[in-house]
Amino acid sequence: MLASARQQFLSEYATVRAREGRGADEAAWYHELPYRDLSGALAHQWTIRARSWRYLERRILPDFARRHGVPLHILDLGAGNCWVSWRLATLGHAPVALDIFTDSRDGLRASRHYTAHMPFPVVEAEFDAIPLPDGFADLVVFNASFHYASNYERTLAEVRRVLRPQGAVIVMDTPVYKTSEEGRRMVEERKRRYQERFGFPSDAQQSVEFLDRKTLTELTRQFQIRWTIHRPWYGWQWHARPAVAWLRRRRPPSRFWILVGEVLG
């Protein structure tokens, strides 16, 4: 990413996140994530994150632990305030948290609330230029972050480089649509909403912002990655979203699958 675009993205991202009420002064707020948002500002969103995490913890990680042993070496890409890395560390794994956002409340510097109790490495870097050796990780986890990539092919090429043989990439809480047209409509709606609320569309990074079925098929072929789709249960209200959208003649809503991409060969 060009330095000017990166700086604009980070400045606008910090504004959005602060206005949304993310982060806190108290360590207790961080230690409760993802199960409770003690501020109440984004309680519904953290409910979704908690269900995704529980599914990963109970249904996906144990299988890889049986295959590779504990600790699993896991890259947490787009780590934000590092809550996923902390949860992974408490399970006995060896995470590395990576992000370009270093804010003290919502970025990498918020890791101090965790590393004082459970140390793990924190790295300021981009998805497409990971400063780690080939074959470093058993797993790469994108927690609500894969869609910030500006080029999925470039990002996955770097992910494949740092994965060990039989490693896997896990994509959580990234919006998935049936078609790219549905995803593009969402992006345009988000830009208009941000322009109205914050005064800018927040598109300096040119993030893709969504996945669709055709793109998943193309990434499978290009990178020899076999995707398994996991569908956590997010409750009846979430389940009813497609029907509600159809009745109101709105675009189809996104799906929040957990995608596990295992490297073949």
Region locations from a protein language model:
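A short acidic, Gly/Pro-enriched loop at the edge of an enzyme's catalytic core
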Residues: D128-V140
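Conserved class I S-adenosyl-L-methionine
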Residues: M1-R67, G69-G80, I170-Y194
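A short SAM/SAH-binding and catalytic strip from SAM-dependent methyltransferases
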Residues: L139-N151
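Short alpha-helix
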Residues: Q205-F223
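Class I SAM-dependent methyltransferase SAM/SAH-binding core
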Residues: N81-A129
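A short glycine-rich, Lys/Arg-flanked "PGG" loop and its adjoining helix->strand segment in the class I
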Residues: E153-A168
